[in-house]
Amino acid sequence: MKYTKIQLALILMPIALGALTIFLVPHLLSFMINDLKANHVYWYVRSEPLLVLMLVATVSLCYTLSQKLHLRKAITLVSAVFFGITALYFIGGEIKRLTPYVGQQGITWSYALKFMDPMVVFGVICGVVLLVIQVMISSPPTSKVKRAKKGIFGDASWMNLKEAAKIFPANGQIVVGERYRVDQDGVCNIPFAPGNKTTWGKGGTAPLLTFNLDFGSTHMIFFAGSGGYKTTSTVVPTCLTYPGPIVCLDPSTEIAPMVRFARKKMGNRNVIVLDPNSLLTKNFNVLDWLLDDSVPRTQREANIVGFSKLLLTDKKSENSSAEYFSTQAHNLLTALLAHVIFSDEYEDSERNLKTLRAILSQSETAVVNQLRMIQETTPSPFIREMVGIFTEMADQTFSGVYTTASKDTQWLSLSNYADLVCGNDFSSSDIANGKTDVFLNLPASILNSYPAIGRVIIGAFLNAMVTADGKYKKRVLFVLDEVDLLGYMNILEEARDRGRKYGTSLMLFYQSSGQLVNHFGEAGARSWFESCSFVSYAAIKDLQTAKDISERCGQMTVEVTGTNKSRGLSLGKSSYNVNYQQRALILPHEIIQEMRQDEQIILMQGQPPLRCGRAIYFRRKEMLAAANKNRFAPQAKKN
């Protein structure tokens, strides 16, 4: 741990205080013996070693008590060294005094040491006792509750770090955290400050906890509140270590600049950045996986139905008419998308979302006329049936459907975003080759307004892996930061349930469990918790999320002692009893108020909950050296 100059001065202060004590004690004794008799003076002078040793240890103890916990360990070490030197000085004087007598008349050292000055001996003993007390107050506080030996009401406990090392070895692929208990570290009582290295404790030096995608569904969910170091503690470290393909959603647009060159060095990888605000951005056709003629037509038609859902803003509404218009808008988009993909009137280069938007950009009358023409000329029964719904629809009803479909594809009128999903620089199937990474630099402000941009891109890559039908080189890791911005995506549930065999692993980041419930419902959220390999919680501020964590960590049995004192005539009588009570392993308020931001709780099936540190990249030298500078993260103070 590195300290500032002021903190170094505070740590070395026991040397100055001890030296001052050694200097003052003789003067104090001289002042006290001025008017004393000779026999009294003798004992005062004899007591000098005892006073010096005890006062040096006492002053150090009092000074240590006045300092913050994270400095006490270093102060205690300095105090122990200084006391040891002082004690050796007095012991050395006694040995020098006794040396001439050793060897005379058969006197041995074991016999001579019995005549050491008792003042020195007792001074050393008292000083050591005070040092032990100083060490105890310098250690992190132990648990406030006493666990019962019998688990009558439950026996929940935190996972042993040795067991954690077996499940999450240090040399794996996906960085999960650091193998140490933050709540048992010397800095546990002070807030984590990224710019102050003295608040880091063991963070940055402890062994890593990593996941090798070797158990469960290989999917992961991370919950961390706003400003909870989701990106710096998990996303960036994983991008620096994962050897397979990555598809990363980055609403903060900070990840790609930091890890791009590091990813390129990992086996000469092809790193693609989709950035609508950059002239150098790559682009691809999000419909290319639907244009594969080797896939049966019926399967392609079913895929079109699923993909068209991604174009709609799926917001839950209690208004039945709004739900109706949304459903019909989905049918309209499905019909027109199928027409664009299968119709002979379009060239292959025109089979994209721009063409779909061009149709919807027409007037309502023109769209209805085109739908009638499609119904009369298309050879596809699927398209004919889908279009037939709208050719006989009342004008006012169709107007509502048309407005909904047009509004949800409005973003395709923005040329930079339309070009992003309608190009040909690469194919969505390229991620299956094991050498391609894709970073989506889509600002959060745009995703808030037009979530469909991110949905269709991520949906295209997920569907491309399904279309590959198990023919992939390495598992593709979908790192979706702030996935709440995308809204409800049915395809994520499909990837969750069947993605393992298709080579896809999901790493989802939410700010609270409420966001997950908001999009998938209570039952859907439970399905996510049941299906993931593990769930991580950190920097939690939401009370409901804290309650959920507390319940999932389980209950333990604690001993509660009580003393009853009787009053009145039977004074002095008291009874002592021990009761067993149930207590949560960790209470909701402890999660919110006492857990530091660099601490997390990991829950997985069949294992105790794991409480450990977070691998914040700028605390680890090897990661800081590999990553480029983060323009958002505060820089550590330089000494």
From Swiss-Prot:
SUPFAM superfamilies referenced in this protein's UniProt entry, alphabetically: P-loop containing nucleoside triphosphate hydrolases
Xref: InterPro entries: P-loop_NTPase, T4SS-coupling_protein, Ti-typ_conjug_TS_TraG-like, TraG/VirD4
Location in the cell: Cell membrane
Record has Transmembrane as a keyword: yes
Membrane topology: Multi-pass membrane protein
Function description: Component of the type IV secretion system VirB/VirD4 which could be a major virulence determinant for subversion of human endothelial cell (HEC) function.
Protein family (similarity comment): Belongs to the VirD4/TraG family.
Protein's name according to its UniProt entry: Type IV secretion system-coupling protein VirD4
UniProt organism field: Bartonella quintana (strain Toulouse)
